[in-house]
Structures are given as C-alpha cells and as structure tokens.
UniProtKB/Swiss-Prot annotation:
Record bears the keyword Ubl conjugation: no
UniProt record, GO biological process: ribosome disassembly
NCBIfam families: EF-G (TIGR00484), PRK12740.1-5 (NF009381), small_GTP (TIGR00231)
Family to which this protein belongs: Belongs to the TRAFAC class translation factor GTPase superfamily. Classic translation factor GTPase family. EF-G/EF-2 subfamily.
UniProt keyword list: Cytoplasm, Elongation factor, GTP-binding, Nucleotide-binding, Protein biosynthesis
UniProt-recorded name of the protein: Elongation factor G
The organism of origin for this protein: Clostridium botulinum (strain Eklund 17B / Type B)
Gene giving rise to this polypeptide: fusA
Protein's cellular compartments: Cytoplasm
Keyword Cytoplasm included in the entry's annotation: yes
Role this protein plays: Catalyzes the GTP-dependent ribosomal translocation step during translation elongation. During this step, the ribosome changes from the pre-translocational (PRE) to the post-translocational (POST) state as the newly formed A-site-bound peptidyl-tRNA and P-site-bound deacylated tRNA move to the P and E sites, respectively. Catalyzes the coordinated movement of the two tRNA molecules, the mRNA and conformational changes in the ribosome.
GO MF term (any one): GTPase activity
Length: 688
C-alpha cells in the first residue's frame, strides 16, 4: 500500500501540561478543526472524545493517554494526549518516549505550575523539542508576558514569543503573528470568522519590540542569518521560519504562541506551528538499541529498513481484548505477519492493526515507519518491549519508571472474589508499570502500591467497574527506604560441614554511600574467589538489600566492592557464596550508620491572602520546609517540601481551613532522612 503522506509530512507530538491547563479541550479543538469531530466535546459536560474511560469523564481529568490520528494541510498528525495529574506521570513518561515533539500548554493566569516542571524535566530527559501554547487568554487574571517569564525563570527555557496577544481576559480578541507581521482577529466563538488585518496602531510599538527580539533569537541560532542580521539586511519570512524550525528541533528555542481553546481562538495557528516547527520522524536522530550480541545498533526512519517498533502502552479493550499501542521506528509491520519480541526473546503474531481515534478505531493492513497504531492479538508483549524483524533483531532502549511511593492493603468484600481480584490486579499491573501488587508474606494481605492516593483510588474504582470486584481498602502506607552514611569494611563466612558435601563461602566487602544506582565492583585479585562465584555474591547482596536492618525496607544509594574472600575446593558452591554475600551485607550495614529515608513531596498551595497564616502554620506542623511564596492573580501561592507521610488527608484539611477556596498540587521530589524520633516510631510499628 503506497503511503498517503511522505515521512517528512508526519508529526508525532504530545500535548502536555499541568492538570486543568486545558489540555484535553485543546486536543478536542484540534480534532474539530482537522475534521474528525463534528460536534466539539466539552470536558465540562463529560462528553470529551479523548477522555474515554468512565472515571475520566466523571472526574474531568485525563488518565490514559489516547493516541489519535488526524490530518492537516497535507500532513498526518498523531497526537498523544497525556495526563497532567502527578499520579499519572507514567503515562507522560511513556508517551514522551515515542514522541518526536510536544506542545506544552500553560494556563495564562498561572504560568508554570509544579506538574509543568515535572513534565518539562521528563521531556528534557528524552530531548523532545517543544513549543509553548499559553491557553485560557480569555480567563480573569490572564497574563501572557508573566507566563513567558515563568518559563524562563522556573524552567530555564529559552522561551521566544512568535505571537503576542491582542487584549486579554474578556477582551481577548486575537494575536499578532510576529513572523508574518500581521494581526489575526476573531469575530465569532467558533473560530470560523477569522481575519488577517494590519497591526492595530496601539500595538505597533510592542509588536516591533517583540519581533526584533524574536529575529535576534533566531539569528543567534543560525550563522548565516546572524551575518544578515548584523549587516542590517532584511530576513525573509521563509528564512525566519526555516531558522526557527532548526532552532526548535535543536532544543535551542521554545516558540511561544497564545490562544483560548475553549473560545476557539488560536488553535488553528497552534496546529500550523506544529507543522511548521516541530520535527518529522526524519528530523530526529536514528533510534538506538543493541543487537542480540549486546553491540550498539541503530535504525533510520525508512520503510526499507528492517522492522523496529516499541510497544509503549498496553490497554485492555472490552471488545477486542489486549491492545498494544506501538510506535514504528523503521520498516513496515503487516497484519498477519510474525515478528520477534526481542526483549522477551519470543515470537509474536501480529493479529489486526488499527489506527486509533481516541476510542474508535480504523483497521489498516500495515503500519509504516513513523506511524503510531495499536496491535491486537499479541500474547507476550508488555510496556517497553521491542518488536522487530526476526532476521535483523534489535532491542531498543526500554523505559524507566519510578518506584511506587504509597501502598495500601486491599481485600475483596467476599471470599469468593479473591481469585477474580488477583487476576484483575495482574491485568492492571500489566497496563501500568508504576502500579505494583504483591502478597505480604507475614500477614497474607494483598498490597497494592502506586504513585499517589488518586492513582490507587482509580485502581480500586476500576476493579469495581470493569472487573466487578468490590474491595475494602486499608490505610495508606508510605514506601520508606533505608541507606547508609559511612564507608565500612565487613566480612562473612558461611561454613557448614556435617558429613557428606558441606557448604563454604567467604566474602570480604567494602561498602560506601553513593548517589544513584547500586554499583557492584569486583576487586578480587589472585583468584581468592573463583570467577564463577562472584555473581552469586552480588546476587546475595542485592537480595539482602530488599530488606534493610532498621525496618525491613529496600536499601538504596550504596556501592559495594568485593575485595577478598576464600573458597573450598569441594564444599564451595554458588548458594554458599550467595549466603556469604547476604551475610556480609547485613554485617556491613549494621556498622555503616544506617538511616531511614522517606519520600518528600514538592507541594504548591494556592490560597486567598486571609488564610495564608493558618495554612503556613499547618504546613510547618506537618514538618514542611518552605521554599517560597508569590502572589498570582490576587491569591498567594505557597511552595514547600513536605514528607508524604504528613500529606495524607490534606485535601480535606485544606478545604476546611480555607472554606473550600484553597487548592493544592503535589509531586514526588526526593527521598530524605527522617528525624530520629520518627525512625524509631516506624521501626517500632514494623516489629509489632
């Protein structure tokens, strides 16, 4: 089947933002203008096309990122709508992994908010080029220029306006396009009656100032344009666009535009911006991975290359079963063909292939390089797995997901539903890598763990709705961690000789605190421990580190060097060295000044001035550490770091303190040492 659009006409992009910045409404408007929806879905009345899970329609927030295909001006757009609620960062993380570009939506009255920072950092990690759309310009308190300065101050991004607004709040009428030097004015609420006019006289000076700043920023990123600029030559519209496109794709500039999605002003210009400035699959570097021998390999975006694709999301559909949302990086995937899941080393048959439009679908015969679609019929494929050609296998880099920070015990209301609940939880864990479930061996209880209270609420809600399992839920528990504060040397000898073959393993280790991942270094010289037993020592240490000595929590941020040991010709075995490694770790930890760590959240609270003293006092009583305050649109925004264990039930407390006028958001920030008294309390609770 011939391509409908060449690869350079593809735009795979996401729409990302803080909760309530108007992301889903913006996507709805894109679908409306690109001709897929005939009536615009409103998030307010629960009819939005992109928010298709029942819980999303009720809560008015986006939980699962729905991938949608549409067309605009001879380009194919694949849009991924990502949730802005902090508990669903996994959705943002996995969609960013497969995007080529993104539109960051900001609320014109709030600017950069905590979740914007989180999502921005995630996009930085994957090097995703972005443009910024300042939405809700019609809202009270809207301020485009303050918004742009929050991007520069809080995100350290080189935000360059390529439009400036005409009017704001209820007087928002349109924008000035600085590239083409014209005013775009809207005369109706559906964005149909839109006219280009000369720039109004009262805006001429401001437009000139911002246009000069924009031209200078674009010229700085391009030597040829810089020469023209310095020599005072006129830079054409085409040159400006080409220069801006290059700088945006290189992450040197973030073009900024404005609008009001709800009032249908500025959305078409935003889609034009996506086409003009965000990358096609050909503009991004070749995707990297490793072949089965562990050597580096890469694939270019081309139909003629061997197939490589990444399954970035697994969803269960009531009608067709398991859907694997997939990005094709190279080659062609055909329905009915066989591919290799190189991550798991298993062959898979491609059943049907569909292109998704939110939650309706169109069947296709094949998906080509650069396309996004869903595969039906895969048996063994999970999130982050690579699907590739059997002849030329490649394993693409998988995705990293954060560990859960909160857990609750859960039990079905009837004994008969126990098995059903187990199967349902396994299905949900397959869909969402940040959701974990296990059985507590001491109590026999089923534990579910996730990224926040809302995350677990929705899991329990889905159990009831989709799987018809009603559950009782216990009080939330915090996922503490343990670590060490000083470097030590320790040893352990495991010896068992009681007739017949004995056991013997002896390991001497040095252990020290470190920032970041666990590191094991083999420093054995002269064969004190035979090479084949060294991985066993490492395994013993890793296994023992899952249960620290203070309160049995996972031990993090440490490094181990295996420096010496001894073995027995007959009695030594992998098992003996594994036990020796585990014992050496426990001995070392006891001497290394162990401490308990707790998750600390970055909290942002917005309250009217009169409640500020009370709210700050409350934050301090929760062991909060103030980071700063500022006034935004007549309200006070308080920023602080607060331990997660102190934030349970905060929504209710804030509501009663501020008569329902305060709002807050929080995002996991880091782990930090707990005070001695709390460490003793946690350790005491664990031993009860």
């Amino acid at each position: 089947m011939a391509r409908k659009y060449p690869l350079d006409k593809f735009r795979n992009f996401g729409i990302m933002a803080h909760i309530d910045a108007g992301k889903t409404t913006t996507t709805e408007r894109i679908l409306f203008y690109t001709g897929i929806n005939h009536k615009i879905g409103e998030t307010h009345d629960g009819a939005s096309t992109m928010d298709w899970m029942v819980q999303e329609q009720e809560r008015g927030i986006t939980i699962t990122s729905a991938a949608t295909t549409c067309a605009w001006k001879e380009h194919e757009l694949n849009i991924i709508d990502t949730p802005g609620h902090v508990d669903f960062t996994v959705e943002v993380e996995r969609s960013l992994r497969v995007l080529d570009g993104a539109v960051t939506v900001l609320d014109a009255k709030s600017g950069v908010e905590p979740q914007t920072e989180t999502v921005w950092r995630q996009a930085d990690k994957y090097g995703v080029p972005r443009m910024i759309y300042v939405n809700k310009m019609d809202a009270t308190g809207a301020d485009f220029f303050r918004c742009i300065s929050t991007v520069r101050d809080r995100l350290k991004g080189n935000a360059v306006p390529i439009q400036i607004p005409i009017g704001s709040e209820e007087n928002f009428q349109g924008m000035i396009d600085l590239i083409r030097n014209v005013a775009i004015l809207f005369y109706d609420d559906l964005g149909k009656d839109m006219r280009e006019e000369a720039i109004p006289a009262e805006y001429a000076e401001k437009a000139e100032e911002y246009r000069a700043a924009m031209i200078e920023a674009i010229a700085e990123a391009d030597e040829e344009l810089m020469m023209k600029y310095l020599e005072g030559e006129e830079i054409t519209e085409e040159e400006l666009k080409a220069g801006l496109r290059k700088a945006t794709i290189a992450n040197e500039i973030y073009p900024c535009i404005c609008g009001s999605s709800y009032k249908n002003k500025g959305v078409q210009q935003m889609i034009d911006g996506v086409v003009d400035y965000l990358p096609s699959p050909l503009d991004i570097p070749a995707v990297k991975g490793t072949n089965l021998e562990g050597e580096e390999a890469e694939r270019n975006a081309a139909d003629g290359e061997p197939l490589s694709a990444l399954a970035f999301k697994i969803a269960t559909d009531p009608f067709v079963g398991k859907l694997a949302y997939t990005r094709i990086y190279s080659g062609i995937m055909e329905s009915g063909s066989y591919v290799l899941n190189s991550t798991k080393g298993k062959k898979e048959r491609i059943g049907r292939l569909v292109k998704m439009h939110s939650n309706s679908r169109q069947e296709v015969e094949s998906l080509e390089a650069g396309e996004l679609g869903a595969v039906i019929g895969l048996k063994n494929t999970g999130t982050g797995d690579t699907l590739c050609s059997e002849k030329d296998p490649i394993i693409l880099e998988s995705m990293e997901f954060p560990e859960p920070v909160i857990s609750v015990a859960i039990e079905p209301k009837t004994k008969a539903a126990q098995e059903k609940m187990g199967m349902a939880l396994a299905k949900l864990a397959e869909e969402d890598p940040t959701f974990k479930t296990w059985t507590n061996e001491e109590t026999g209880q089923t534990i579910i763990a996730g990224m926040g209270e809302l995350h677990l609420d929705i899991i329990v809600d889905r159990l009831k709705r989709e799987f018809k399992v009603e559950c009782n839920v216990g009080a939330p528990q915090v996922a503490y961690k343990e670590t060490i504060r000083k470097a030590v040397k320790a040893e352990a000898k495991y010896a068992k000789q009681s007739g017949g073959k004995g056991q013997y393993g002896h390991a001497v280790i040095e252990m020290e605190p470190t920032e970041g991942e666990y590191v094991f270094e083999n420093a054995i010289v002269g064969g004190a421990i035979p090479r084949e037993y060294i991985p066993a020592v490492d395994n013993g240490i890793q296994e023992a580190s899952l249960n620290g000595i203070i309160a049995g929590y996972n031990v993090i941020n440490f490094k181990v060097r295996l420096v010496h040991g001894s073995y027995h010709e007959v009695d030594s075995s992998e098992m003996a060295f594994k036990i020796a490694g585990s014992m050496a770790f426990k001995n070392a930890m006891a001497k290394a000044d162990p401490v308990l760590l707790e998750p600390v959240e970055k909290v942002e609270i917005t309250v009217p001035e009169e409640y500020m003293g009370d709210v700050i006092g409350d934050v301090n009583s929760r062991r909060g550490r103030m980071e700063g305050m500022e006034e935004v649109s007549g309200a006070q925004v308080i920023r602080a770091f607060v331990p997660l264990s102190e934030m349970f039930g905060y929504a209710t407390s804030l509501r009663s303190r501020t008569q329902g006028r305060g709002v807050y958001s929080m995002v996991f920030d880091h782990y930090e040492e707990v005070p001695k008294s709390i460490q003793e309390e946690v350790a005491g609770n664990k031993t009860k």
